[in-house]
Amino acid sequence: MKKIVLMVMMAMAVLTTNAQSEYPTSKVEKHDVAILVIDMQNDFVDPKGKLCVAGAKATVPAINKLIAYGRSKNWKVVWITRDHRTSGVDVDAPRIPLFVDGKTGYCVPGTWGGALVDGLKPEKEDIMSPKYRNSAFFNTNLDLMLRRMGVKTVVLAGTQYPNCVRGTANDA
């Protein structure tokens, strides 16, 4: 299957506008497109988060603009979240210390840190797809879901660019 990956560093690059339009100048306007919103959870985005990425909170308006544009073109929206068990048994070795000695860890489903940051809200037709490693494709059913939806192009937006956005782009 042909896949084209448009990487959006911190969701900003695709939102370049021209004088005639408030919308992105991208030529991608087909209906076989999905936006993958990656790791926009409190622990990564909110300044009080355990692994906050500097500047990530400022990308929320740009991501919302990208999503609105995509929805106007009937693009799919897939929310990729990093999910870990409270025990930390499923985390990468360098992050195990965040789960020991009574610590609650990060990106645990059902916790504040694991929730999407304020300002981003999935709609009922959106897909929620948890991941357990950097890439949204590694050991998940994301590829199967995208194929079944007829998606041939993915637009990546989110945080943790050196790890999760890039890992997802590499595996796409």
Predicted regions and their residues:
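Active-site-proximal flexible loops/turns
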Residues: 9, 46-48, 88-89, 137-138, ...
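Hydrophobic h-region of N-terminal signal peptides that target proteins for export
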Residues: 9-17
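Positively charged n-region of N-terminal signal peptides that target proteins for export
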Residues: 1-4
